[in-house]
């Protein structure tokens, strides 16, 4: 499975759909208030939440998820999404 990692000059987020998180035993409430949710997409902050998902994914699937990076030199619109209610 392929996931996207978005970054701006200040931070980065791994985009994961809710169903993929649930497939590895995680719910939106498993993540901190520093991550965001827009519809069925979770944007997991890079410092803790993205690692939590990647570790759960690797434990469940015995492989590393494919991650494609997208970076911007401007503040990301992700910062305007609602925060996950932890």
Give a label for each model feature:
Residues 3-30:
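N-terminal acidic leader/helix
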Residues 43-86:
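Short, compact, well-ordered microdomains
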Residues 10-12, 38-41, 50:
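Short, surface-exposed beta-edge/turn micro-motifs
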Residues 32, 36-45:
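A short, exposed loop/beta-hairpin motif centered on an aromatic-Gly-Thr core
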Residues 1-4, 29-32, 51, 79:
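Short non-domain terminal segments
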Residues 1, 38, 66:
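Sparse, context-dependent recognition of short Cys/His-centered cofactor- or disulfide-binding micro-motifs
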């Amino acid at each position: 499975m392929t996931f996207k990692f978005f970054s701006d000059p200040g931070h980065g987020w791994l985009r994961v759909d809710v169903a993929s998180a649930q497939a590895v035993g995680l719910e939106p409430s498993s993540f901190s208030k520093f991550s965001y949710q827009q519809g069925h997409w979770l944007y997991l902050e890079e410092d803790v939440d993205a690692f939590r998902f990647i570790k759960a994914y690797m434990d469940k699937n015995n492989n590393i998820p494919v991650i494609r990076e997208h970076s911007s030199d401007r503040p990301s619109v992700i910062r305007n999404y609602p925060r996950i209610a932890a």
